[in-house]
Structures are given as structure tokens and as C-alpha cells.
């Protein structure tokens, strides 16, 4: 008898799995190995990661998305107002299953430098990469979704996608099979269809129904802040390869490069001020944005003098430790109908996994956008969970077992919790004009900017 090759064996296993699923579906609910609830950026990336893994080729994977497949016939002329800062680590994940090539074929803007500075003093910190390296990439969320969807459609033999499929309820199996109840998670859809899955992955956002239905608790608070987003046109064309962020007393404002002539605005402020910014006329809005980046009205003479003394001392002892200050570009106009706002908050699930369920992305953690880490944390979850599921499949283990799911939870919480705590601390530290705190953060920021090894560690952690 002729031996089966690896690809032939994989096809045979997949056919057996699919025929088993059809047989079960003829007498009861279809059974899947993995069901992903939520087809956003993180959920679709999870589907792509599983669909491309050689150890999972014979597994039945389903992606449930409540909305329609978004039409994307051609690249829009205007930029979307919702963008993400993609780290090199996230780009590596997207490249590993082919989605990054689709993004490169559409559009993205690399940046090589980041400058962060205080509106209440001259303190700043800069992050630079080597001349040939990109520090990160600004990509429109719609383009990321389209790239992932295109790649997923190439994996239709391995991953099934159900659009317009909203889950109504979930039924959980007992921790130990008693032989009476189904050993799988049961999903009831709005159209009356029922599905069974050995592992349910919740990628359904910060108001996750999966998390709530599983009884998984979360810690949360509202910042009483809103993010205002808009697409801005610059006064003149530049290389525009710097990401700018200034900490105002009312909240951080960021200018992220989209092209040589356009940038994306993300301004965190009070809900009342956000409403004003969204509704004011274009000329007033542009003047307000330029003033937010250029005005020194919040400067304190005492704080500025103290900061200058420290800067001089640091420059004397470490003359090559800090990069020169650059001036941000001037804004000439705002793209019509690009202004919008959304509320901000922090949320963290106390547990990412339970028997036959795992949370990823915003379903597990929601963070302030000031560090640009939200979707990157989600992509980190995808890479980690896909790795552990691949190992489980290779070892012949049950994908829904808590054994390897706990390894995922431990690894991701060790990364996510310190990052979320640091972002929350920064938000609170810069949300005041109290002189002692302003002086403390001014001295701390300048000292950090002078210590290249410390900055390299920060960049390495944030780039994962």
C-alpha cells in the first residue's frame, strides 16, 4: 500500500472531519472545532491565523460576523477617519498569513520617528529607529479589514465565514462530561440555527456577549473622555514620517501621518469639548487644532526654567542621549464629513479563558488610545492563542482544554496588564496642571529622553 504524503494526509483528515460534521448536522447541530464570534480586525486575523496553520488544516473553523461583507470595489480617494498604528510585531503576524501583502498593495504610511511633548513645559521625548527601519505603520481600519477578508477568502477550504449571523445565546458544557449533556458549547443564532463548537473564541468587542454569557468578570471605569477623530490636510507637502503627540491639560492630541499631504487626528478630551470640536465650523476647527500643537499658553516660567536646567545638565553629561526637537506640521483644512467622536474607557477581563472559551482583543481588554496599542494588543492575543492551539493540535490534544488555554492567558496577561497600567498612569499623570506634578513629569520625561537604553527597552516592548 502506498504511503500517504503530508498534503494527502491533511486532505484526508479534513474530508473526514467535514463528513463527520455533515453527518452530525443531518441529525443535529453542526459541530466545529473552533468558532470565532466577531469579524472585526482581531477576529478576522484569528480566523486567518488558524486557517493558515499547517497543524490545523484538518480542523473545522467558523467565523461568525453579525454584519454584511463590507463592499470594497476600489480604493477610496479620501482617507478614512479611523486608523491604527501597526507595530512591526503586528505587521509580522499579518505577513505570516499573507494579509500584509494586500495592505502593501493598497496603502499605508510608515513612520520612522515619534515625538511626544508636554503642553505645560518644554519637556519632550523622541523615539527613533535606524534610518532604514520603520518604527510603525499608519493604516486605515477599513484597509486592514479588507486585506484580512481577501486573505480569508483564499482559505475558504479551511475556514467558513457566516455573515449576517448574530448569536442570541450560548450554552456551556459542564467542566466534566457526565454523558448526558453535550460536551461542546452550543450557539443559538438569530435565524434559529444551532451550532456546536469545541472552542469558542470571543472577539466581539468591549461589550462582549461571549464574556458576559460565560460569567467572566471585568474591571472597568469610564474616563469621562471622548476621542475626536478627523482627516486633516497639511499646509505643505513634507516627508511626513513622524507621529506627533502632545499632552494637553484636557487630554492628549495626536497627529498620525497618512501621506505626504494628509494626517489623521486623534484628540482625547472632555465630552463637552468633543461635541464643540465636531460641530464647530471648519476654519475654527483648524485654528483650534493648530493652537493645540503650537500654543504655549499653559507654560509655567518656573517649570520651564527647572526643565531647562535639567536639560543643560543632561546634555553636558550625555551629549548624544537625546534627539533634537522638531516642529509639527501646520494644518490647512479638514476633510469634509471626517470629524467624529467616540467615548473612551478602560476595561480588563479578570480571566481570558474558561473551559472551551477564550477571549481576544477588546473582549479581553480595552485601553486608552494614547499609546496606539489597542489593536496591537489584540493581534498579540491572536499570535499567542494561534501558537498554543497549533501546539495542541500537533500533540493531538483537545482544543478546548484549559491546559493550553491557561498558557495563553498567563502569557498575554503578563504582557497586557503592565502595558495597560502604564497607559492609565500616563493618562492620569498628564491630566492635571498642578505644579508639583507638572514638575515631576517634566523632569522624568527629560531624564528618560536622555537615557537611550531605557528608550530602546520601551520601544522593544511596545513593538511586540
UniProtKB/Swiss-Prot annotation:
Belongs to the UbiH/COQ6 family. GO terms for molecular function: 2-methoxy-6-polyprenolphenol 4-hydroxylase activity; 4-hydroxy-3-all-trans-polyprenylbenzoate oxygenase activity; FAD binding; oxidoreductase activity, acting on paired donors, with incorporation or reduction of molecular oxygen, reduced flavin or flavoprotein as one donor, and incorporation of one atom of oxygen. Its EC number is 1.14.15.45, 1.14.15.46. It is a peripheral membrane protein. This is Ubiquinone biosynthesis monooxygenase COQ6, mitochondrial. Keywords: Cell projection, FAD, Flavoprotein, Golgi apparatus, Membrane, Mitochondrion, Mitochondrion inner membrane, Monooxygenase, Oxidoreductase, Transit peptide, Ubiquinone biosynthesis. Component of a multi-subunit COQ enzyme complex, composed of at least coq3, coq4, coq5, coq6, coq7 and coq9. Interacts with coq8b and coq7. It comes from Xenopus tropicalis. GO terms for biological process: ubiquinone biosynthetic process. Pathway: Cofactor biosynthesis; ubiquinone biosynthesis. It comes from the Eukaryota. It is found in: Mitochondrion inner membrane; Golgi apparatus; Cell projection. InterPro entries: FAD-bd (IPR002938), FAD/NAD-bd_sf (IPR036188), Ubi_Hdrlase_CS (IPR018168), UbiH/COQ6 (IPR010971), UbiH/COQ6_monooxygenase (IPR051205), UbQ_mOase_COQ6 (IPR000689).
